[in-house]
Amino acid sequence: SLTLANEAVSVPAAYRLYLPEAWAKDRKRRAAVGVPKTVKFQTKWQIALDMIDSVRAEGLPGAPVLADAGYGVVTAFRDALTERQMPYVVGISRETTVWPPGLEPLPPKRSSGKGRPPSRIRRSSKRKPAPVLELAKHAPASMWQHISWREGTRGTMTSRFFWLRVRPAHRDENRHEPREVEWLIAEWLRGESVPTKFWLSTMPPDTPIEQLIRLAKLRWRIERDYEELKGSFGLDHYEGRGWRGFHHHGSLCIAAYAFL
């Protein structure tokens, strides 16, 4: 689903049922529940891009895209947002690799004079990217700061954060040049032995860290929307097995939620 949100209000703007590949290829099951012939298998991040494009085509203004790590770890998803000139703040896994400041891939090998000249950047055993967990875990204590981002039901929401400008490194050995520099943000929750939450962001380099963290944390509104849609508006009460019926049910739940 796609939700439009700010710090004061949020509402789902688009949603689509994810169809597993096994279902997408099974004609009998598709026919039994009325899946349209035009619906093909798409990964969740591809569906997300389609919904973003659809909402933008309706004339809604562009805004930073927020997504959890299920989407943020997909380099193709992040690249597609950049191609659309849409800045993002997306969750990533602790294993995501980046080039820290002052460290970049090696240039292409020198040409031997035979065949096509090498054009891909390189890594070596001594020059390679680092997982974001290792980078954050070994950062000096002075680089971690307590920052507050909103008032919650139990008081001010505050945690310890680390941020740095880095280059994402995923499969860049297949590229001709390094990726652009963007933000890495890490959060070290109280009581945890290591940092546990990480984000990448293409917001401008002069973006205040407080704004970056507010955006990263804005997903709480989306989670709250789902809790209310399920608990108070019956989104998860649909008992049918029809494609159209499910989407009609979901549309009515969301319309009622937006109205109230």
Where are the predicted features?
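Short, basic/hydrophobic alpha-helical segments
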Residues: 39-63
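Short, conserved catalytic/metal-binding motifs centered on acidic residues
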Residues: 1-2, 64-71, 88, 199, ...
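Short, surface-exposed basic-aromatic patches at helix termini and helix-loop junctions that form
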Residues: 57, 76-87
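Short, hydrophobic/amphipathic alpha-helical patches that form generic packing surfaces
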Residues: 250-260
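A short acidic (Asp/Glu
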Residues: 73-79, 98-103
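Acidic, metal-coordinating catalytic cores used for nucleic-acid/nucleotide bond scission
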Residues: 67-74, 94-96
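An anionic, glycine-rich sequence signature occurring as long contiguous blocks
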Residues: 5-41, 89-93, 98-221
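Short, solvent-exposed helix-loop connector elements
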Residues: 76, 201, 209-216, 231-248
